[in-house]
């Protein structure tokens, strides 16, 4: 059962009920709290575009608690974060793994955070192929291309050399929030919201 809390807000015109995500959106907060697929990406992209159109000068906060997911869906979110004018601040709550960690590192420089007990994990893309030898070869070339692209972008966002990223993403690489800060995925570990 998927229960989404409702918030009641008192206004001069009476009461208004919001689902919690709509209420947070009013404060320019977006929650990425699930695996990343096309539907989730479309929702995040829509929220980013809406907030950018509403006020292009005001920061947007993207809270991430995600095990990762689809590369193309994640890149749609990434490209939109870079495309819009407002800075997108990223905050890891819980876990940012795989594409979740990639998006965490893609936040505006100086505005990438994690809470103290968060865990961050980077690795190379996962994939599988079946079918004729030619189809397997095409799939293998594509995943190698995507791996190189993701490594280059992650190197740019962390300040690490591409060779270090290649080595460190060869297998699942789990980090504490402090280690992710040292690595350049985030800028600071937060213990309180007013430290942001």
Curated annotation (Swiss-Prot):
Pfam families to which the protein is assigned, alphabetical: CLP_protease (PF00574)
Molecular function GO labels: ATP-dependent peptidase activity; ATPase binding; serine-type endopeptidase activity
Biological processes per GO annotation: protein quality control for misfolded or incompletely synthesized proteins
Compartments in which it is found: Cytoplasm
Gene Ontology cellular component list: cytoplasm; endopeptidase Clp complex
Keywords: Cytoplasm, Hydrolase, Protease, Serine protease
Disulfide bonds: none
Active-site residues from the entry: 98 (nucleophile), 123
EC number(s) on file: 3.4.21.92
SUPFAM superfamilies: ClpP/crotonase (SSF52096)
Main location: cytoplasm
InterPro entries: ClpP (IPR001907), ClpP/crotonase-like_dom_sf (IPR029045), ClpP/TepA (IPR023562), ClpP_His_AS (IPR033135), ClpP_Ser_AS (IPR018215)
Catalysis performed (reactions): Hydrolysis of proteins to small peptides in the presence of ATP and magnesium. alpha-casein is the usual test substrate. In the absence of ATP, only oligopeptides shorter than five residues are hydrolyzed (such as succinyl-Leu-Tyr-|-NHMec, and Leu-Tyr-Leu-|-Tyr-Trp, in which cleavage of the -Tyr-|-Leu- and -Tyr-|-Trp bonds also occurs)
EC primary class: hydrolase
Entry keyword Protease: yes
Family: Belongs to the peptidase S14 family.
HAMAP family in the cross-refs: ClpP (MF_00444)
Quaternary organization: Fourteen ClpP subunits assemble into 2 heptameric rings which stack back to back to give a disk-like structure with a central cavity, resembling the structure of eukaryotic proteasomes.
Function summary: Cleaves peptides in various proteins in a process that requires ATP hydrolysis. Has a chymotrypsin-like activity. Plays a major role in the degradation of misfolded proteins.
Record protein name field: ATP-dependent Clp protease proteolytic subunit
Gene source species: Geobacillus sp. (strain WCH70)
């Amino acid at each position: 059962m998927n229960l989404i809390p409702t918030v009641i807000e008192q206004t001069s015109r009476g009461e208004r009920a919001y689902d919690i995500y709509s209420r947070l959106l009013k404060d320019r907060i977006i929650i990425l709290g699930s695996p990343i697929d096309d539907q989730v990406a479309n929702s995040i992209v829509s929220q980013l575009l809406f907030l950018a159109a509403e006020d292009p000068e005001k920061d947007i906060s993207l809270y991430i608690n995600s095990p990762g997911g689809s590369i193309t869906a994640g890149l749609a979110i990434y490209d939109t974060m870079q495309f819009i004018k407002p800075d997108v601040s990223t905050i890891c709550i819980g876990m940012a793994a795989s594409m979740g960690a990639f998006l965490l590192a893609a936040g505006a420089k100086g505005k990438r955070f994690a809470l103290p007990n968060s865990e961050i994990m980077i690795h190379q893309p996962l994939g599988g192929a079946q079918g004729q030898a030619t189809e397997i070869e095409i799939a293998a070339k594509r995943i190698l291309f995507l791996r190189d692209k993701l490594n280059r972008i992650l190197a740019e966002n962390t300040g690490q050399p591409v060779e270090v990223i290649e080595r460190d993403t060869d297998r699942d690489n789990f980090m504490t929030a402090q280690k992710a800060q040292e690595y350049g995925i985030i800028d600071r570990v937060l213990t309180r919201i007013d430290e942001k």
